[in-house]
């Protein structure tokens, strides 16, 4: 039967039926007749809706496929086939917009012409018997019932068949065809006899013979027969005594359950050591942009042209010198690399026509900075078999680092609003169904809250840099290509703006595997003096390269302009994820959406509008040493987005491990707050697993610090 269903029905219908059975905990391998019945019912619901539209005059019309008028409003809203939460959201929305009475059970369709819900039935028995069962179950005059049988009979409330003769004939023909196909394969009798009434019937299912012997052999230890195991499972209390459960398990399991009380958990131990350093691929709050408004120059949109145009807006260049050396690097090479960039950009400007890309001369300073010829020679393993002391080279353990205040400042800054608009979501067509209308409304509200956010700027900057670097890595594998770090935005007044943050020079990039590394040197403009927090800039050599005139309330003032230079590296897989940083917007929108859904299910109506427009309501944002921080819904949106963006910018194995292990402790603490009396074993092992992830990563250390604040306030 399962094979027949997969051959006979559209794959989309099969997939929806699989999901429905999974949702109700039914096994389609066993309940094959039910699988076929669900697919049949879904197909009838879809056929009922197909080709039926409402025109501008409010009349119901039938329109075949490929008709230019196919953008008319659908007559029927399909509720069947959606997961329960979404289905009820649609039903609630329809009731709110049309004034229809809310049904007790989920109906299958809503008819916008007749303004009524419809329950579709497909039966293998007498239509009038099935109709009465449906009517007794629903007990509502507002839901229209329409029953079809496999023999071509039908029955509907007050003999009102809703659809025209031809549409109903299509459904009956399809049902008859399904019956014939089943009969040809010898499946029909079993299918016909398997139909139950609307009330579920419990029966004792006996297992005999070989299956019984197999069942007895397959029991867990300490169970002598299937009846004992059944009785144990039936009496299993999920929140019962854990020790009792463990005693029934294998003798190998030896765990003493300790009660988890308010006094049980201790704070996570953060490592001691020198302060942690900045390790993102580009500057965040410290970045400085050279910008042009309303770009209309020749070659606008070509990165090199845009970069040169932005560079021309600054007139305060001066002879560069080192203000904060890199402790381990040859700092003169970083200085020479910047001078080379300036000189080669000047050469481009002197040319008659500016090229689209610029490959840097392979000077000694760039070769050093990009690690050219530094990789150890690869030797085939077969040629080394005879070497007696062959071993992997020793690698040093990473040095432990302590949490530093700069990472919290970075996060706070990422949550702030800028004076530019960083995302513009394209129009995606007119909303037809209620669920689309709700989705668009939520998306628009969310976009309004985050489009000016600095975290959104980081997304667009990350997408641009990773895309440009991956393109160059594939297109110019052997070249030291100069890649401008650019972003685009709009001012509050709606004027377009192109920004230059600095430059990247890419090293050799023969990237065969996803994890093969391409080295690059980044050179980024900033007004931040590195001497204020030298530990943050451990990996950088910082030059002073000019003086910038800034307008302030007290007039013009001059500030030194710095260039942050460092050697860095990335891989194909990291660039691929960097290019997809816009996913962070989706992730944080989904988190907000789940908050709206929770609110809506309590109020039994869609609360999107109230959620975003009630400015007086304060929402919890996070934990700090002061307690639970609260803010507007806009602040919640921006904080969730910033967390998602930082998870992307500071992605690492340390973060993966900390997130997975700390979640376990979080769940236990939440169970305690919910008075569920949790018990634990090997809590020390869990702390060990969490703390081994706290090494030197600034974002992980900050998350651990937040977790400690949560523990303090949650267990008061």
Swiss-Prot record:
Domain of life: Viruses
EC number: 3.1.-.-
Motif (Nuclear localization signal 2 (NLS2)): 184-247
BP term (GO), one: symbiont-mediated suppression of host mRNA transcription via inhibition of RNA polymerase II activity
Chain sites annotated for binding Mn(2+) 2: 80, 108
Post-translational note: Phosphorylated on serines and threonines by host kinases, including human casein kinase II.
Keywords: Cap snatching, Endonuclease, Eukaryotic host gene expression shutoff by virus, Eukaryotic host transcription shutoff by virus, Host cytoplasm, Host gene expression shutoff by virus, Host nucleus, Host-virus interaction, Hydrolase, Inhibition of host RNA polymerase II by virus, Manganese, Metal-binding, Nuclease, Phosphoprotein
Molecular function terms, GO-annotated: endonuclease activity; metal ion binding; RNA binding
Compartments in which it is found: Host cytoplasm; Host nucleus
Cellular-component GO terms for this entry: host cell cytoplasm; host cell nucleus
Residues annotated for Mn(2+) 1 binding in this entry: 41, 108, 119-120
Cofactor dependency: Mn(2+)
Motif range (Nuclear localization signal 1 (NLS1)): 124-139
InterPro entries, A to Z: INFV_PA, PA/PA-X, PA/PA-X_sf
Cofactor comment text: Binds 2 manganese ions per subunit.
Role: Plays an essential role in viral RNA transcription and replication by forming the heterotrimeric polymerase complex together with PB1 and PB2 subunits. The complex transcribes viral mRNAs by using a unique mechanism called cap-snatching. It consists in the hijacking and cleavage of host capped pre-mRNAs. These short capped RNAs are then used as primers for viral mRNAs. The PB2 subunit is responsible for the binding of the 5' cap of cellular pre-mRNAs which are subsequently cleaved after 10-13 nucleotides by the PA subunit that carries the endonuclease activity.
Family membership: Belongs to the influenza viruses PA family.
Complex and partners: Influenza RNA polymerase is composed of three subunits: PB1, PB2 and PA. Interacts (via C-terminus) with PB1 (via N-terminus).
Protein name: Polymerase acidic protein
Organism per entry: Influenza A virus (strain A/Hong Kong/5/1983 H3N2)
